[in-house]
Amino acid sequence: RRGFKVVHMTGFFLNFLGATDSASNLGGIQMNLLFPFLIVWAIVAFIMYKGVRRGIEVVCRVTLPILMLLIVLLVIRGITLPGAVDGLNYLFQPDWSALKKPSVWVAAYGQIFFSLSIGFAIMVSYASYLPKKTDVVNSACITATANHGFEVFTAIGIFGIVGFMAGQQGVDVAEVAGGGVGLAFMTFPTAINALPAFNALFAICFFGALFIAAITSMISILQAVIASMHDKFNIDHNVATT
């Protein structure tokens, strides 16, 4: 099982992504990724050209409810699978000894900084469009609470499915659970493929949710840069977007 997992990861990073063994070796262009890459950037560029009101706000009003619906479907399916309890026990059973590991704290800081966009100027950029009398402290508390609550809710569905996969393979949940790219593009697709029914539907739910989360993150990061260029150097919005 361990050997299969290593081969699976190697195949994904080397064959599909075209990853190299050195940062100085850029490798070649992956043609299977070039077209989707250009499409995504074209979508993002169109949204950014539309501005905050007609672009970002409209996209968020449409995509975020869809994201929540997709996640709800995944969670419902995840907790109803055989073996889901094992995955949830793994998720919520604390391992206090892990707090002694610096890598755990680094991962936690990295997660929270990215999740709440701390240090990216994204919150400052978005907050600048609020009315002047807005209670910023209250808004910040609501944002942090909603973000963390949604993350835990999503984790319940993910670890339910991971627990199911561990049961199917006859291994511990710890051997199946991973993080980052490996979990999203290797472990989870394998788990979805092993579902007893409606595999395609839940694959659409998962990757649809992942796409929405990714593209809204791209938009927020770019908006911080564009707003900074506009405010600091008085550059026109469309010029800054370009």
Where are these predicted regions, by residue range?
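Interfacial segments of multi-pass membrane proteins
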Residues: 228-230
